[in-house]
């Protein structure tokens, strides 16, 4: 089956590369990806023919199903985030417009079929380079345990060393078991995915040992339609601080004890019946959510890309940074 999709302001490589959904794909060439794990593994190929057109090839004759899957997994379920920039506060709008122009066409892929695969990639990413280590570990896991979650949970140390010897790999069975137990208490994965994303986030943090705010946010952002979710990492804090997005007052990162029982806003509180966090005024996640709203996940992804390429914590590339004129932290 061949299918062509018209797209507006979209970049396939820029959208998939930083996303955890990329863990079930493999980039074959510029603008060309094939699915290597999960649903339609080995049957789906996607290529960006030109800025306004994608080519989809799939070894199944179910065009409606494939189109829906592709729209979710490529981030096409949401309009270009650039369209929402004019609604931002004037104090940050010009900086974010310029930052967006450096990374045009970025969307947020989500997976509604391969949630356990995404969870594996997310938990492996804790303090690990995604491109160098996580993708390599994932490929080995897909090859050895593809679709057999119980076998991975019950794997002993000798089996796990076939994947890697890092603590991230060794902890994987325990974290997967915690996720399964958490979703079973709710009636299964389908029931979990029907929860409000803010509540799902809090439940993961509360019930899954070893899962804190960053990992929970990363998972929810990758499997729910929840573009406001902001995983807080060093790139986000560094870039946001240097660009003047979070003010001069010192901010705090989200914490597991608070995030397991509170939410960041009155709106989230009304949807989840959880109280508003007492730290909202000083928490970087809450502060940025109030500022950018639905653009939260998009902003986090852009700061990840920008932080990795230019705005590094150590030895930043200020002399070639496209944002150097707007940076309040450059020497």
Say what each PLM segment does:
Residues 1-331:
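HhH-family (HhH-GPD) DNA N-glycosylase catalytic core used in base-excision repair
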